[in-house]
Design a protein with these regions (language model features):
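Short, well-structured active-site flanking segments
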Residues: 118-127, 203, 263-265, 371, ...
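Short active-site loop at a secondary-structure junction
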Residues: 94-99, 344-347, 371-391, 404-407, ...
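Active-site SXXK
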Residues: 108-110, 256, 329, 358, ...
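A penicillin-recognizing enzyme superfamily signal
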Residues: 319, 323-339, 363, 370-374, ...
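Soluble, non-transmembrane domains of envelope/secretory-pathway proteins that act on or interact
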Residues: 1-2, 17-24, 30, 254, ...
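Conserved catalytic neighborhood of penicillin-recognizing serine enzymes
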Residues: 137-161, 402-457, 472, 502, ...
Length: 742
């Protein structure tokens, strides 16, 4: 306790002495005003210098924006077999790890740009003094002394002006980086952010661009060429000026020799080599953009990654694209020979959906589409016309108990003021459902839609991701206020290939971030929309559309089913607004649409859906030459094939005669020529006073036995062929007369 009090007294005495000394000193300075001002000036300079020094040393954090140290990186899009499918970027940069860069490449950059990189703390003061001396001599800022860290700081956080203030900020940022990051961190970031001309950023991208190889495979001379380019990328690019590139590369090799990285003999040998660059890579093919736009929009919606982030984030995306199909689809869409329209501004879209995965194998959004354009025709809605009939009417009717050979009435009808006519204004009376679909009858479609119920049809559309707010019978003919996209239509029709199961289509299979971490997404839905028998019957009927119906024009040798569709132009009589064909092969579904961005008096099609049929069949023919499309559809287990149609014969040779039966009883035999179709049922009639009377039936046979014929009078007989599929009868045969006495 005593010692503590003594310490306190000592401290108080020292404080009093200091205060006394300060007062005496100030009195002396007051008597000599010049000395007071000099002392204050020196103290101010020391104080300000100290503040400035500590601000430079520790103020770099105010300049460094760590968000900018996350470099924009190219998102790579590739197919399932690893083929390059496209790139998305703001800066074309493939990031690499420092461990992947060979030592001889690192030494090329260090020897050229910052020989003392591993020994300084961000600023090389020896180089600074040399540069300051030259600046003073020239009375201007003529030489830089930037280290690799300073270059990185300038490129990431500052501008390119040559002011002392910018240089001070550069020093501050560099010293901050050196205190907070390792040399390897700085060097890796530096190599990844460099620009190499031609829109190429980062050493990995440059390696692939100039040499078609990974940075890990670069040779000494190749690394030297890249190291030399960064001083003036456009000046030293081998694709712009080969002579400059060689000279600059040799300068770098000399620097490596001077720094002790190369022996003299090795230097001379390397300087004698050519540049070894590959042919300058071509720009991305035009046919890729259409698909990449679908990828971007899908990732935005399913993965919640914005377009900007996708173009900066360095993701790796695997897609369902088939490059051959995509190219073929593009070449056919851009071929003007298929189009018959009022002018050459006509547009088209083709979408191909894989049967098994529902993956988008090809998507063309227009004849000249580029990423970001508003009118991607594969993603824009169009009125579907008659392509909606199977989806909203005929297959739902099969689900509700109708059969492909159920009879429907084909005649002009009026439904509370809504008059329905066939496109050709021809009517056939009662016809089978399958025939109504094959011939794309409007009257039967609307009548059947009315019979099963509008809400029933809409329910099936909704389950096929084809919801509509419309409520009228016009839905049955595709007369919608909005419509559907070619992607939606191809996806919906793909259900017929999959036993009635609807699967959401998609372009993206998987996506990983720049660190290789997989990003989860919303799983596509799978819904049993139709019974597999209904789906199979519909597929069979759609095959007949191609062989015998509205899609029978033009040739295609493979298995093909499909449905045509067209919509009327609103103002030009007889013109078409939208032309469709949805085709199904055993392996995939293809949706083709032809029309205009805006349809008006000057923009219309002069021909209907046949031009979409022509384009599709030509496309399939070319695809089949590249990769064989299977020749038969997969029949599901436990289903029946659609029966072949029956043509009833004209019977003109009915004959009647007597013969002996058992126990010598008299009998009569009727005979006639039969059809080769043994499914036909033959009704046998006997004419009586009350008219004709059905006395028997036989199936597939050309004879009938009358066991107890009348022998006392002449009897007349007829035969009528019956179609068992529709229960329709044909024409009566010629009469056959039977009499024992004549």
């Amino acid at each position: 306790m005593r010692n503590s009090q003594e310490v306190k007294r000592f401290i108080i005495q020292v404080k009093n002495h200091i205060i006394s000394a300060f007062i005496k000193s100030w009195q002396v300075l007051s008597e000599h005003r010049w000395l007071k001002y000099l002392t204050l000036s020196i103290a101010s300079v020391i104080l300000l210098s100290s503040i400035g020094f500590f601000f430079i040393i520790y103020g770099g954090g105010l300049i460094v924006d760590e968000k900018k140290m996350v470099l924009p990186a190219t998102t790579m899009v590739e197919t399932t077999d690893g083929e390059y499918a496209g790139r998305l970027y703001t800066e074309n940069r493939l990031l690499t790890s420092l461990s992947d860069v060979p030592d001889h490449v690192l030494t090329a950059f260090i020897a050229t740009e910052d020989e003392r990189f591993f020994s300084h703390a961000g600023v090389d003061f020896r180089s600074v003094l040399r540069a300051v001396y030259k600046d003073i001599i020239a009375l201007d800022k003529v030489e830089g002394a930037s280290t690799i860290t300073q270059q990185l700081s300038k490129n990431l956080f500052l501008t390119n002006d040559q002011s002392w203030m910018r240089k001070t900020k550069e020093v501050m940022a560099s010293m901050y980086l050196e205190r907070n990051y390792t040399k390897n961190d700085i060097l890796e970031l530096y190599l990844n952010q460099l620009y190499f001309a031609h829109g190429v950023y980062g050493i990995e991208t440059a390696s692939q661009y100039f040499f078609s190889k990974a940075v890990s495979d670069l040779t000494v001379t190749e690394g030297a060429l890249l190291a030399g380019m960064i001083k003036g990328p456009n000046i030293y690019s081998p694709y712009i000026n080969e002579e400059n590139a060689v000279a600059r590369r040799n300068v770098v090799l000399n620097q490596m020799h001077r720094a002790g990285y190369l022996e003299t003999e090795e230097l001379l040998q390397l300087q004698g080599q050519g540049l070894g660059v590959t042919s300058q890579p071509e720009a991305a093919p035009l046919y890729i953009d259409d698909y990449l736009e679908v990828v971007i929009q899908e990732i935005e919606s399913r993965y919640n990654i914005t377009r900007d982030e996708l173009q900066r984030g360095g993701y790796r995306v695997t897609v369902h694209m088939d490059l051959d199909m995509q190219k073929q689809a593009y070449e056919h869409v851009t071929n003007t020979a298929y189009y018959q329209a009022s002018n050459d501004e006509v547009e088209a879209s083709v979408v191909i959906v894989d049967k098994v995965t529902a993956g988008l194998k090809a998507v063309i959004g227009g004849r000249d589409y580029t990423i970001g354009q508003a009118h991607h025709q594969a993603l824009v809605t169009h009125q579907p016309g008659s392509t909606i009939k199977p989806l909203a009417v005929y297959t739902p009717a099969l689900e509700k108990g109708y059969h492909p050979y159920s009879l429907l009435n084909d005649e002009q009808k009026d439904f509370d003021g809504y008059t329905v006519r066939n496109a050709n204004n021809q009517y056939e009376g009662d016809i089978p459902l399958v025939e109504a679909l094959v011939e794309s009858k409007n009257t039967t479609a609307v009548s059947l839609f009315n019979a099963i119920g509008i809400e029933t049809g809409k329910e099936y559309l909704n389950r096929l991701n084809l919801s509509t707010k419309d409520d009228g019978l016009a839905i049955a003919l595709g007369g919608l206020s909005s419509g559907y996209t070619p992607v939606q239509m191809a996806t919906a029709y793909n259900t017929y290939l999959n036993e009635g199961v609807y699967r959401d289509s998609s372009a993206v299979i998987s996506i990983t971030d720049r660190n290789g971490v997989a990003i989860s997404s919303i799983e596509p839905t799978e819904t049993q929309v139709f019974e597999k028998q209904s789906a199979w019957y519909t597929l069979n009927m759609l095959e007949r559309v191609v062989t015998d119906g509205t899609a029978s024009s033009y040739d295609y040798a493979g298995a093909l089913a499909g449905k045509t569709g067209s919509t009327q132009h609103a103002t030009v009589e007889g013109a078409t607004k939208d032309a469709w064909f949805i085709g199904l092969t055993p392996d995939f579904t293809v949706s083709t649409w032809i029309g205009f961005d805006q349809s008006d008096d000057a923009h219309y099609l002069t021909k209907g859906s046949s031009q979409a049929v022509q384009l599709t069949k030509a496309l399939l023919t070319d695809i089949n030459q590249i990769q064989l499309i299977r020749s038969e559809f997969d029949r599901p287990s436990g289903v029946e094939d659609l029966p072949e149609p029956i043509t009833l014969p004209e019977i003109t040779d009915l004959n009647a005669s007597f013969g002996l039966g058992g126990f010598n009883l008299l009998r009569a035999e009727l005979s006639w020529s039969t059809s080769i179709d043994d499914r036909i049922i033959y009704h046998v009639y006997e004419v009586t006073e009350d008219g004709k009377k059905l006395i028997g039936k036989t199936t597939g046979e050309g004879s009938y036995t009358i066991k107890r014929p009348s022998i006392l009078q002449m009897t007349r007989y007829y035969v009528e062929p019956i179609n068992p599929l529709t229960n329709q009868g044909g024409n009566l045969s010629n009469p056959a007369m039977l009499s024992l006495f004549e």
